[in-house]
Amino acid sequence: MERSSNEVSNPVAGNFVFPSNATFGMGDRVRKKSGAAWQGQIVGWYCTNLTPEGYAVESEAHPGSVQIYPVAALERIN
């Protein structure tokens, strides 16, 4: 199988580290502040030009379902 010139030759694998100034950590319980309800645990993070701090949240009600949200949309719960 041939590779195109824009393919990644060495995929990234293994552990990654949250930024040192992250608002939430892996496993923290959070919920959306408004709009459609979503509550669960932090399972990852992301950043883009428009969202410098965002999180992946796995639903407690529907295990395996994950949504991504900017930090401003989430609040910590106990």
Swiss-Prot record:
Changing Q67C: Decreases affinity for NADPH and dihydrofolate about 9-fold. The keyword NADP applies. It catalyses: (6S)-5,6,7,8-tetrahydrofolate + NADP(+) = 7,8-dihydrofolate + NADPH + H(+). It is an enzyme of class 1 (oxidoreductase). NADP(+) binds at K32, K33, S34, G35, A36, V66, Q67, I68, Y69. Signal peptide: none annotated. Pfam families: DHFR_2 (PF06442). The keyword Metal-binding does not apply. GO terms for molecular function: dihydrofolate reductase activity. Coiled coil: none annotated. Its EC number is 1.5.1.3. Keywords: Antibiotic resistance, Methotrexate resistance, NADP, One-carbon metabolism, Oxidoreductase, Plasmid, Trimethoprim resistance. Pathway: Cofactor biosynthesis; tetrahydrofolate biosynthesis; 5,6,7,8-tetrahydrofolate from 7,8-dihydrofolate: step 1/1. GO terms for biological process: one-carbon metabolic process; response to antibiotic; response to methotrexate; response to xenobiotic stimulus; tetrahydrofolate biosynthetic process. Substrate binds at I68. The active site is situated at the inner surface of a pore formed by the four subunits. Homotetramer. Key enzyme in folate metabolism. Catalyzes an essential reaction for de novo glycine and purine synthesis, and for DNA precursor synthesis. Type II plasmid-specified enzyme is practically insensitive to trimethoprim and methotrexate. This is Dihydrofolate reductase type 2.
